[in-house]
């Protein structure tokens, strides 16, 4: 099973590529950020785009990067702008930024 440390290290290693796609901040949230993951857990990643670079193509490229990094895991990507007003504050409180 993937570890929190592996996920954070993989994100850090790819930080420059993500930056070129307009990502200002990227972080891990959910069960992995709380060290409560199980075999059924997905990897929850929060991304924050530079407004002028937030577009479908860049989002799909970011999704492809994370799917390649974590091939055997389910990955959920959420943009900061796409956070629900109800659960968003909880996510922002627990996110571990890289």
Regions found by a protein language model. Give the residues of each.
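Catalytic core of pol beta-like nucleotidyltransferases
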Residues: 1-25, 33-39, 52-98
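Short hydrophobic/aromatic beta-strand micro-patches
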Residues: 46-48
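Conserved histidines in hydrophobic membrane contexts and catalytic metal-binding motifs
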Residues: 28
């Amino acid at each position: 099973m993937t570890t929190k440390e592996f996920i954070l290290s993989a994100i850090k290693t790819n930080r420059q590529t993500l930056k070129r796609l307009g990502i200002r901040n990227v972080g891990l949230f959910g069960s992995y950020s709380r060290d409560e993951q199980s075999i059924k857990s997905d990897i929850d990643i929060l991304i924050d785009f530079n407004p002028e670079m937030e577009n479908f193509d860049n989002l799909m490229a970011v999704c492809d990067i994370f799917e390649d990094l974590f091939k055997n895991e389910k990955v959920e990507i959420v943009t900061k702008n796409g956070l629900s007003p109800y659960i968003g504050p909880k996510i922002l409180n627990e996110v571990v930024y890289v």
